């Protein structure tokens, strides 16, 4: 078994399309396993850039069912089945998520039933590779354990009606990576994030002049401000804190806050190691957490 523990941000963006920040998705490589957290827009393209065949994905974890976190799910599931150097999955697509995962995958199977039928008849693809193996959960606790990799789900607070929504703590080789998912300031993130080697957290910010707008207040109210992220990082004390799902709100008249402004607000409450995540940024987790920027459009 390999001792490698690596986290790569495949997509660090939001529902609004961006060529620089694809939809939320994170690749976790732990020993001999490859796990995906969420499946936002463009995840398959980022996997291709990393030379990671979709058929190598051992487990798809879902945090919640907002479309920006699931829109690439059918692409990963279907394209990973096709006969190619990038696919050729012959075993069921394994999915773990909070209540709703089974309904989501059953509906995808119905939506693509004609395509599946045609490809089986025309390309002789195995039905075993398009089958799904879905596990749901509805409370905090371990949801997966195999070959030294342990995944613990914990509920977070993405808003009063945006439920269920969960984060993940992944343990391997005595190391820990924690992923907040979409959430407001939440004590469960602090509980499960304490002492993590890497804590990957969402963040949202708008300029003060935009905060008077009701829809902006509503969006910010579903996420964590840089100031509150700093409070969380100060209490959890990770070796490295990193942002993903970077929400920089704007309007026609008001530009988005800059990343410099975002970091400046974090520094009001946190003075430790910090990275503002970028697509294809990776973190090698060992005695220290090493950051690599891998963005490439080749």
Predicted regions span which residues?
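Binuclear metal-dependent hydrolase catalytic cores
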Residues: 1-177, 256, 261-290
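Cap/insert and terminal regions of metallo-dependent hydrolase folds
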Residues: 167, 174-176, 184-281
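A polyampholytic, Gly/Pro-enriched intrinsically disordered region
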Residues: 292-298
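Short glycine-rich anion-binding loops that position phosphate/pyrophosphate groups of nucleotides
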Residues: 156, 205-206, 295
